[in-house]
Amino acid sequence: MNFQLKKLFFVLIILLFVSTAGFSQKEFFRSQQVFTKEQLSDFYSSITIQDGLVLFNANDYYLYAYDKNDGSLKWSVETNYKSTIPVFVQDSIIYAGISKKEIHQAALFSLADGKLIKTLPFGPLATKPLIKNGMLYGTAIYDYGCIVAYDLKKDTVTWSRFIAHGYSRPPYYQQNKIMANAEADNWVELDYDGVLLDTTCAVKPDFFVEAIPCVKKFTALSHDGLEIKAKLSADIFGKDFIDQPDIITTKNFTFVLYNDKLSILSGRLKKKQQVQVSSLVVELVENDNTKLVKADNENVWILYSDHLLQYNHKTKKLVRLTNLTTWQPHSVLFDEENIWLISGKDGLLYGLSL
């Protein structure tokens, strides 16, 4: 091999290394809990960020609030409840789960100091609620799984509708109606008074909820409100879809991750792109902890084999590969140029600068 060929070969090797090497990151925060083996063997934990606070529902049944800028602990409260579902915050009120004498309930806490305001007459919220005109609409463990309407001022459940395991799927809250899941691809239309809107029964359900005679059949709604169903659903969600869909919508796109396949829909359910995630990082071995983290109109971020992938779906190129194997992330949350994660190794909360 002559000198010029050797030089070219060397440059190609360097470029290959640079293109696949993971980016480094700096750990600027680590929480100080010490979890027992028993607590970590029953791993339920979650995070969210609201009004400058990182809210950490930890494996020790406490809810912690940290200042996201300096990492200081603002407050902590024992809830005797832990969940992979993050707490919800609106109008400086935290909606979280609480457990007393092995009875699980939803509860309100003050965002400012963590003090318990009151418990609610139903189980912990399973999806992000809608608060509108003094009413809370949400899904919860109530009468074995319902969508409920709760009057915040009167402290009463105004109405509820049994939807079985559909309570774990976020409803679609639209201007004049709610579309709630009632297991699998069955969806029921309700008005905000809890009245069933579909009485034609053009489509009948294939589940055991007798109080819901009429449904719509689809897997999910796209970013532009169209039903993803039939052949398209089978292609992007799989033919035997029963799990929670891994889906993110932006103003212009719908992103779906199923197994190793990323599907991107543009307007009117048009398939803009499909890509095998493993083809972007052939050096990594896929594991079960693969999920969408964030997406916008140019990039999508995916947690894959303890790495964070940033994929530009406009240029169809991998932009960045961040190695997170040190922390074995259980869940990841973006905050501007930083990420917060819960380690699957020790259960602690970490803050990393990218």
Positions of PLM-derived features:
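Secretory-pathway ectodomains
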Residues: Q25-L354
